[in-house]
Structures are given as C-alpha cells and as structure tokens.
Amino acid sequence: MSILQLVLIALMQGITEWLPISSSAHVMLVSDVVGLAGRDELLINAASNAGTLLAMLLYFRKDVAAAIAGGFELLGAPVTRKPLSAGGRLALCILVATPFALAGAVIYENFIPENIWTALRSVYAVAASTIVFGALLWWADARGGQSRSEGDMTLRDAFLIGASQLVAVIIPGTSRSGITMTAARALGYERVEAARFSMLIGAPILAAVSLYGLLGLATTPADGMGASLTDGLIVAALAFVSGYASIGLLMALLRKMSFLPFVLYRFALGIALLATSPIVAGAMG
C-alpha cells in the first residue's frame, strides 16, 4: 500500500471517530484513494480502530481505570449490597448504553432489505443525514442547559444516550459520536461531559470492531493480500496520534465554545458530498 493511502486512512479514522462530524461521509469523499477489500480491509480497519481506541483509553485513563474497578464492584454488589461508588455508577451506565450499537449492527447486517441498505448508503442519503443531524446537534446544543455534569448521569439518561446509537448504525452519515453528544446535550449535560460519556461508551464498540477484524483475518484466505503487518502498525500508530490530538482539541474547544463549528463543518461536508455526486458533477461538467 502507498504511504498516501496509509496516512489518509489513519487520519480519517483518528480524527473523525471522536469528533461529531461523521466518518461515513469522509469515507465517501476519499473512497477512490483508500478503497480496500478482503484481508487488506480487515487488517487496516482493525489497526486503525485499535489505534483510535488506545488514544481514547489513554486520554481518559482515570475514567477508564475507575470504570474497570467499578465493573468488579458491580460483580460483588449483589453480595455486599453496598451503595455503588462513582466508578461503579459509571461502569453501570456504560454497561446500559453499550449494547444498542452492537444490536444496531446486527439489525443493519441481517434485517435491512438490500434495496433500503443500498439507498441508505447512497451519497445523497449520507449527505442529507450529515446535514440534518448536524442541524439536530445545533438545536440540542442551543436548548440544552449546562447544569448537569458527571455525577448527574442516571441509568435512564445512559439508556437514552445509548439508544441514540441505533440511529447512527442504521443511517450512515449520522455519526455515532454526534448523535450521542446530541442526546446528552438535549438532556442538559455540559458539553465536556456529553463528549466524555460519548467516547467512553464508544470504547467497547471499537474493541468489538477491532476483534471482528482480527477474527476475519484468521478465516479469510491470504491470497492477494497487499497490506503488510508493517502497514497495519503504521496505520495504528498514526490513528493513535491523530485520535489523541483530536480528543484533546475537542475537549479544549468545548470548554470555551459551543458545537457550532462542528455543525457548520457538517453543513459544508454535506454540500461537498452533493457537489461531488454523479448527477451534480455530470450537470456541472
């Protein structure tokens, strides 16, 4: 694989995974350059997702450690009957929110008719969802208060935020990060807390995607594989660095301003997708 392909894939994954700007839309913009198939796709996707996941785990290492300790606390809760600590509540909220994205993936792969599946992945549908859900983020951010923080997360809120991921899985262009941050802002959570919880509940999903890719490598014939292990390591490293930087940038911006810059970016991205669509490009040509 060329260096350009590796860099584009890594940066696209690392930057777009955690920002509320839709990775599906970006994939469409550069699909001709980064097009992958077979074992190449499995290896590179697993590597890029793993790198991005490690970036989030490192950035939120204190929260992750608290959630892991809280998970063990949950296992003993029926016996001890003690009130849960902050880490225990966080682990429980993540546990409640996570299954929806996995369920959505099963629904998308097995129960969506092929004609609808094709329509949802068209450039027009992705462009429309990029714009529409950008507007929804704008609305939620404008109406949502700033009164609720980390300690205010309830199981009901975790359920609602987690359930919003179903939309992102089924409708490409929605953005999993974007829709969960939208839901959290609509529920009144501070912008930084909305982003933090969105990323924490994304960790199990990225882990599952990476594992799926690795399992696929073990069962897919090796013939014709162009990507090497070195390519995978390069992608993972670049995705890690760009992912860590994008998380830091997002959190810094949200401490000072609203989600409006990301909303405007989504509008521009949706318009760019429409402008590069076959019909529009043909008409302009």
UniProtKB/Swiss-Prot annotation:
- Mind telling me which residue stretches traverse the membrane in this protein? 40-60, 92-112, 122-142, 159-179, 197-217, 233-253, 259-279
Query: What compartments host this protein?
Result: Cell inner membrane
Q: How does it sit in the membrane?
A: Multi-pass membrane protein
Question: InterPro entries given for it?
Answer: UppP
**GO biological process annotation, one example:** peptidoglycan biosynthetic process
Asked if Transmembrane is a keyword of the record, the answer is yes
Under Enzyme Commission nomenclature, its number is 3.6.1.27
Which reaction does this chain catalyze? di-trans,octa-cis-undecaprenyl diphosphate + H2O = di-trans,octa-cis-undecaprenyl phosphate + phosphate + H(+)
User: Which GO terms of the molecular function aspect are on file?
Assistant: undecaprenyl-diphosphatase activity
Gene Ontology, cellular component aspect = plasma membrane
Q: What else is known?
A: Bacitracin is thought to be involved in the inhibition of peptidoglycan synthesis by sequestering undecaprenyl diphosphate, thereby reducing the pool of lipid carrier available.
What role does it play? Catalyzes the dephosphorylation of undecaprenyl diphosphate (UPP). Confers resistance to bacitracin.
Q: Which family does it belong to?
A: Belongs to the UppP family.
Protein name from the UniProt record: Undecaprenyl-diphosphatase
State the encoding gene: uppP
